[in-house]
Design a protein with these regions (language model features):
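Ser/Thr/Pro/Gly-biased, low-complexity, turn-/loop-rich segments
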Residues: 1-295
């Protein structure tokens, strides 16, 4: 039994880090909570308040008090002797200004350039939101997350893309409209988080089928499988693979290509070999272009 367990663990480790791994898969097997945002402030500047968010209102100076209010079902909070302030759909900065203006109606020391009472509004407990991760996800389904969560948070909760899922064109759908597309390679290779938007109640994160997949072996820094977008070619692939190791021959790449069914002939191999000469990291003049096909 122990031997079977060790064998299964070795196979799992190989699937995440060995030559048979898909680039990016190990990212979703980090410790739990790596991408789980806190359930209380601070929040990004573009965070918009909603029903259930908790506000902490602090005033000091000529008047001192502290209030805690939860945004109610009407999307507002009620201030003593000052009335209602609408919060839902506004940023924290906008809400702070509205609260300061409302309090100034009953506390003269808050208003004007010579105000002797300062007001600060911060966020306490954040509301939960329900989002959906569908398509080719490892664990598709509905997830309750903090309202400070982003697309990456939802992906991590769902275990990331499945073996058949794309790492390159993950879509954030709000209503019936795609509002952002996340390329995980841009994040993993260059640290770029374009498309990693804050989530809202009812958002859907959709993982489509993967694009072309190419297997890199030999003396590169990260030999494994890579998913390639339209327009990407051999230099892009070598860049994703971390470049060549010192012992590599820098001016030649061998490609083993599996032929499409329409190109196969009876009695002939189902694959061909191509030698691509490189110059300055690109196919040399007169060499095959190095177009990469799925498989």
């Amino acid at each position: 039994v122990e031997a079977l367990k060790e064998g299964a663990q070795a196979a799992a480790d190989s699937a995440l880090t060995g030559e048979n791994a898909t680039f990016g898969a190990s990212f979703f097997h980090l410790d739990a909570g790596v991408f789980q945002p806190p359930s209380f402030g601070p929040v990004p500047d573009d965070y918009r308040l909603g029903v259930g968010d908790e506000l902490a209102i602090h005033a000091w100076g000529e008047v001192d008090f502290q209030l805690t209010r939860v945004v109610d079902r009407d999307g507002a909070v009620i201030l003593p002797r000052s009335g209602k302030v609408v919060c839902a759909g506004r940023t924290l900065g906008e809400v702070e200004g509205a609260i300061r203006e409302q309090l100034a109606r009953s506390h003269a020391s808050i208003s004007g350039d010579q105000a002797t009472t300062q007001v600060e509004v911060t966020l306490g407990q954040l509301r939960p939101i329900r989002v959906y991760v569908i398509g080719e996800a490892t664990r598709p389904g509905s997830y309750q997350l903090s309202s400070a969560s982003t697309v990456l948070t939802a992906l991590y909760a769902a275990g990331g893309p499945a073996e058949t899922g794309s790492y390159r064109e993950i879509r954030l759908v709000r209503g019936s409209r795609t509002i952002a597309t996340l390329d995980l390679y841009a994040y993993l290779v260059r640290g770029e988080r374009g498309g990693d938007h804050l989530l809202q109640e009812g958002d859907t994160v959709f993982i489509p089928n993967r694009l072309r997949r190419v297997h890199v072996t030999g003396p590169v820094r990260r030999p494994m499988y890579y998913e390639m977008r339209a327009g990407e070619d051999l230099p892009d692939l070598l860049d994703y693979a971390g470049g060549l190791r010192p012992e590599a021959v820098p001016d030649l790449v061998h490609i083993r290509r599996v032929l499409a069914a329409k190109d196969r002939r009876p009695g002939q191999p189902d694959h061909v070999f191509l030698d691509i000469a490189l110059k300055d990291g690109r196919p040399a003049p007169g060499s095959p272009a190095g177009e990469l096909l799925d498989g």
